[in-house]
Amino acid sequence: MPEFKIVISDPEAKADLPVYKVKVKGDESIEYGDDEKNQRKLPVCKLNPKLLEKLNAVHGIVTVRIRKEDRKFNYTCKATADANVPEDTVHVSLEWLGDKVGAEEAEGEVFRAKAWQITITSPAADQLIGLKIGDTFDGGLVGLPGYKLLIRGGSDNSGFPMLPSIPGPVKKRVLLSGPPGFHPREKGERRRKTVRGNTITHDIVQINTVIVYPKKE
């Protein structure tokens, strides 16, 4: 039974989009069960409707970031509008917050999510078997109905990357001069590496995708 970790990138979540400082509060009413911990679905967070509008989170997905000493913790979540939450505050799972920072409240920031991950299994995952790098599939499989996701690459359970230039559901050793699969330390350096072909098989564990938006005229 195939299981794929789908990495979703949002090309319209630019680096210059607004970032707002917020108080992050743990909310015991927000569920953080096995599905959320195993990334089968995004956890929920609660935001004031005015803050959610400012973030311009088209898909309703935001990232809450907390910095503690020299570490940072990201909580990418499906935002729910709640007028009872102050505009400068975000509510997240109390269990998650306590586990990460050992407190019920913390200082943080929130912004439109640039990327996130969802894990899918059969029967949804079966629909991706045989697709190739450059193909698209229905975003509804990962909670993005109405959008297509473009396959950009992936890797197997040994970390061997899929290469667009290698046709078929294969694994082979090839001579590489650059990524994916090899990052040369010197100009002109080449190395023989094991890679996967451009086709998704049961051996693939991660699929890298990007959201396809309508072309702007």
UniProtKB/Swiss-Prot annotation:
GO BP terms: translation
GO cellular component: ribonucleoprotein complex; ribosome
Domain of life: Archaea
InterPro entries the UniProt entry points to: Ribosomal_eS6 (IPR001377), Ribosomal_eS6_arc (IPR020924), Ribosomal_eS6_CS (IPR018282)
Matching HAMAP family: Ribosomal_eS6
Family: Belongs to the eukaryotic ribosomal protein eS6 family.
NCBIfam families registered for this protein in UniProt: PRK04290.1-1
Listed name of the protein: Small ribosomal subunit protein eS6
